[in-house]
Amino acid sequence: MQPPFRSKQEVIINAPLEAVWSFSMDLTKIPEFHPRVVKVDLLSGKTSREPGASYQCHLAGGKHTCIEKDIEIIPLQKIVTVLPEDTFGISKILSDYRVETTFQMLDHRSTKVEISHYYSTTT
């Protein structure tokens, strides 16, 4: 069962869907687009996203890290990621936290990316 929807961010990228998807599938590119991530360790030894691929993100400031794991990939449509472990306590408080990133071609030169957050709370 999926936890409740909590928030969503979206961005329009002036690039074709295939280019945006290809860039997003490369785990080594995360620091290039995520403002809080400065480095990624490939825990699964995989440079590309796939179900089961785990990676550790080092956050800006150097104090915190989080381990993320991709659990579902629908090519050119969706990436589902969970947060099994982190050093700032989110995974303990929100044990079912998951992120669904969806990709939608708007035209041949632009793509909408939506990042939706789901998690349960105790209250």
Identify the function of each model-found stretch.
Residues D86-T123:
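Beta-strand/loop substructures that line and gate deep hydrophobic ligand-binding cavities in soluble
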Residues M1-G45:
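Hydrophobic ligand-binding cavity/cleft-lining segments
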Residues L17, I71-K78, T102-K112:
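A short, structured loop/turn motif at beta-sheet edges
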Residues V11, V40, C57, T81, ...:
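Preference for bulky hydrophobic residues occupying beta-strand positions
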Residues R6-K8, H64-E68, L94-V99:
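Short, surface-exposed coil-to-beta transition loops
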Residues P3-F5, P51, G62, S95, ...:
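Residue-level preference for beta-strand/loop junctions
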Residues D41-K92:
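Glycine-rich portal/gate segments that line the openings of hydrophobic small-molecule binding cavities
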Residues A19-S24, I30, Y55, D70, ...:
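Hydrophobic pocket/interface hotspot
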